């Protein structure tokens, strides 16, 4: 046993390092171990690299799969968006944009009432007889072409097409928009349709072909609007305004644009109109009508609004502004009519309307900014409000009314301050400090240089006499002579348009005072 154990010890690995051997014995062993380590390292590196390649392959494969899936999802989203856009486009063909947005967000559209919208009704004259002598296919195609042109014009002027009924075309302006701007757009569209029909007439006449005539009617009032149906939805408007628009159209003449008095009051500033009588309605009474002869020369370029004109800037300002001037004007005139004393024969609501018309004319020719134009008109509405409370030195009271009321109609603090300054500038003797003040001062006394001076002067005398501020016509003439002699206009427009007749009116008063002859 001792021998065997001793022999085993001599042959163990540990014996190699414990036994005393020569260096030549250890060197090969060390080399072998190093080689073994190197080989092991190389194998391990190859294993790691192989694993990396496998992982990189898997990652690349997964990345390509994800990228492919992403492309598929994006394509699906694109197709969904395309279909949604098509659906929206189809909806927009039958519904106004704000209604489409409400329908998409809420899933339904509430029935709403809209105040002071403008409805345009167009009808082809004698269509029944036209249909009798024409092929139905030709007739439908021609109607489609014509109504497509009407659609383009309606879209240009931001009108919402409501429907076509046979040969009748119905559109509306002002659903969710400003009254003044939508009424202007509605009448502008009517004039452009009139121009289109004239061009089609000339073209047909040159080929000895039949041409169509249309009647156009526009009315401004209140409507109820909503979406009808669930499967085949349709947007429609209802109310007496629609019926009146139809009556206005049917009482028009071919090639004419016929508008109601309510529309005329909104657009008369920008269009040349002529009165043409009235019609009786069952629920509304008599409605006065006006033909629109064209656009006011100040804004016209070959019969259409000049795109580079002041009017373009005014429309842009109105579209962005929150000011509701039409609502303000209606409120102010109604308030003055109710509150002003009936013996104010000069300073009544009619005077405010007169000055408003004058300030608009002067402002056009003086080319004030769109904002300045609005401020001037607002100041005119309030410049006689003070007469509600007291007769003398009432401008300050009018300014106080303006400060209280104007913010409710979209005027900001800076605009209200400017309007109050304009009201104060109308005090006599007038001392205007800027362009707007010069304009309102000239507008307030515009009648001095007009043909209706004598009748207005007579009303002023009767008013002053009723307030015991003048005793006789002779005294009144002396007051007028002194006042007119010291008065002078400030704007170029008034100087050129009113000075000559003002001088003649002054001479007449002087002559009458000298002869001591007065009209009753």
What are the functions of these language-model segments?
Residues 165-166, 206-215, 257-263, 368-375, ...:
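Acidic/histidine metal-binding catalytic segments
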Residues 223, 251-316, 479, 493-494, ...:
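Cytosolic regulatory/linker segments at or just downstream of nucleotide-handling modules
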Residues 293-295, 300-324, 340-370, 382, ...:
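Divalent metal-dependent phosphate-bond-processing catalytic cores, especially two-metal-ion Mg2+/Mn2+ enzymes
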Residues 143-159, 175-216, 220, 240-250:
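Alpha-helical scaffold within the catalytic cores of cyclic-nucleotide enzymes
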Residues 355, 373-390, 394, 398, ...:
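His-Asp-centered metal-binding catalytic motifs of divalent-metal-dependent phosphohydrolases/nucleases
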């Amino acid at each position: 046993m001792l021998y065997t154990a001793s022999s085993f010890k001599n042959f163990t690995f540990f014996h190699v390092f414990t036994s005393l051997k020569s260096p030549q014995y250890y060197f090969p062993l060390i080399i072998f171990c190093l080689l073994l380590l190197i080989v092991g390292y190389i194998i391990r590196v190859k294993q790691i690299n192989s694993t990396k390649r496998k992982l990189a392959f898997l990652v690349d494969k997964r990345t390509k799969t994800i990228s492919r899936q992403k492309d598929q999802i994006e394509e699906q989203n694109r197709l969904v968006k395309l279909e949604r856009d098509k659906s929206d486009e189809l909806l927009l063909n039958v519904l106004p944009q704000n209604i489409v947005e409400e329908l998409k967000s809420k899933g339904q559209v509430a029935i709403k009432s809209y105040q002071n919208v403008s409805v345009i009704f167009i009808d082809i004259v004698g269509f029944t007889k036209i249909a009798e002598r024409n092929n139905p296919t030709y007739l439908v195609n021609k109607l489609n072409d014509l109504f497509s042109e009407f659609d383009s014009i309606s879209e240009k002027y931001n009108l919402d097409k409501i429907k076509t009924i046979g040969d009748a075309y119905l559109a509306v302006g002002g659903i969710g928009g400003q009254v003044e701007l939508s009424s202007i757009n509605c009448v502008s569209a009517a004039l452009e349709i009139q121009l289109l029909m004239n061009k089609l007439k000339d073209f047909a006449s040159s080929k000895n072909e039949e041409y169509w005539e249309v009647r156009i009617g526009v009315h401004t009032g209140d409507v109820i609007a909503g979406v009808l149906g669930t499967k085949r939805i349709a947007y429609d408007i209802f109310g007496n305004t629609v019926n009146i628009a139809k009556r206005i159209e049917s009482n028009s003449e071919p090639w004419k644009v016929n508008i109601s008095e309510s529309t005329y009051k909104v657009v008369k500033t920008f269009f040349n109109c002529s009165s043409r009588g009235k019609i009786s309605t069952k629920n509304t009474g008599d409605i006065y009508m006006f033909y629109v002869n064209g656009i006011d020369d100040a804004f016209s370029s070959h019969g259409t609004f000049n795109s580079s004109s002041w009017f373009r800037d005014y429309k842009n300002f109105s579209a962005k502004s929150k000011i509701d001037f039409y609502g303000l004007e209606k409120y102010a005139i109604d308030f003055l009519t109710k509150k002003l004393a009936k013996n104010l024969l000069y300073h009544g609501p009619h005077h405010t309307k007169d000055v408003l018309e004058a300030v608009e004319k002067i402002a056009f020719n003086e080319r004030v900014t769109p904002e300045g134009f609005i401020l001037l008109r607002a100041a005119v509405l309030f410049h006689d409000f003070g007469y509600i409370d007291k007769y003398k030195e009432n401008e300050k009271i009018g300014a106080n009314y303006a400060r209280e009321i104007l913010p409710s109609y979209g005027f900001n603090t800076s605009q209200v301050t400017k309007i109050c300054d304009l009201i104060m500038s109308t005090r006599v003797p007038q001392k205007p400090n800027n362009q707007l003040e010069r304009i309102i001062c000239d507008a307030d006394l515009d009648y001095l240089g007009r043909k209706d001076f004598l009748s207005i002067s007579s009303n002023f005398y009767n008013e002053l006499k009723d307030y015991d501020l003048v005793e006789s016509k002779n005294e009144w003439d002396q007051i007028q002579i002194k006042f007119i002699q010291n008065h002078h206009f400030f704007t170029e427009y008034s100087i050129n348009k009113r000075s000559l007749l003002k001088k003649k009116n002054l001479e007449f008063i002087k002559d009458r005072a000298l002869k001591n002859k007065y009209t009753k």
